[in-house]
Amino acid sequence: MDIKGKTIVITGGGQGLGRAMAVYLAGSGACLALIDLNAEKLAETAGLCRAAGGSAHTYLANVAREEEVVATFERIVADTGAVHGLINNAGILRDGLMLKARDGKIEKRLSLAEWQAVIDVNLTGVFLCGREAATKMIEQGNPGVIINISSVSRAGNMGQTNYSAAKAGVAAMAVTWAKELARYGIRAAAIAPGFIATDMVASMKPEALEKMTAGIPLRRMGTPEEIAHTARFIFENDYITGRVIETDGGIRL
């Protein structure tokens, strides 16, 4: 798919990886539909997209709420005319060990609220946005592409029961959708980033960063632009579907 002039929806598009992917795709002439909960960050990203050569529309919505997702995709089609691509990027963290004990006594447990908050956004939100994007593509007879942002944590990571479960789920959904939606000309895939040099990571202590990168064969963290490049590759390569691309510097080798 040539993304020039195509409408690409990005959830969590206000900052971080979402912003990087939006600006990168805008540089290829895409029309971005950015969904986030932070109006100020959305406006900043939209300005960067326009400066990069693309166009951008912004939408305030909680991806975990069905009625908001349905209404937002209706607005996107009304504003841009179509939905050609979706990057399911929105996500949150509520890290913590499932339980912590000392001398046979439980001191702390991961709460149901901490579990559910992550599942609602990182898994249910991906389902809702994927469903609505596919609905619009099929209704308009447009082929399209859905990309779910997973993580190397989908294989299981200490302190991330909720996050790992959600990221494994969105990878499985990408494979499932690739099988279900191919008949409509819709491709689906996932990206599993490793350690990426976002603003949050950059604020870590040098010794923590050194320890983090020591286990990566390429001996460095990835950049947000490298994840964005992977997304563009999936959009533009019409023979890619149902695959999870690990952009992780080899950490899972």
Annotate each PLM feature:
Residues 3-32:
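Canonical Rossmann dinucleotide-binding motif of NAD(H)/NADP(H)-dependent dehydrogenases/reductases
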Residues 6, 54-55, 82-83, 105, ...:
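Active-site loop of short-chain dehydrogenase/reductase
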Residues 39-40, 60-72, 112, 226:
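The beta1-alpha1 cofactor-binding region of Rossmann-like NAD(H)/NADP(H)-dependent oxidoreductases
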Residues 84, 92, 105-127, 147, ...:
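Catalytic Tyr-X3-Lys loop
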Residues 93-116, 139, 159-162, 202-204:
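Conserved mid-core segment of classical short-chain dehydrogenase/reductases
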Residues 106-114, 147-169, 174-175, 179-183:
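Catalytic loop of short-chain dehydrogenase/reductase
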Residues 130-131, 175:
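A short, exposed helix-loop element centered on a Lys and neighboring polar residues
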Residues 220-247, 252:
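C-terminal substrate-recognition "lid" of short-chain dehydrogenase/reductases
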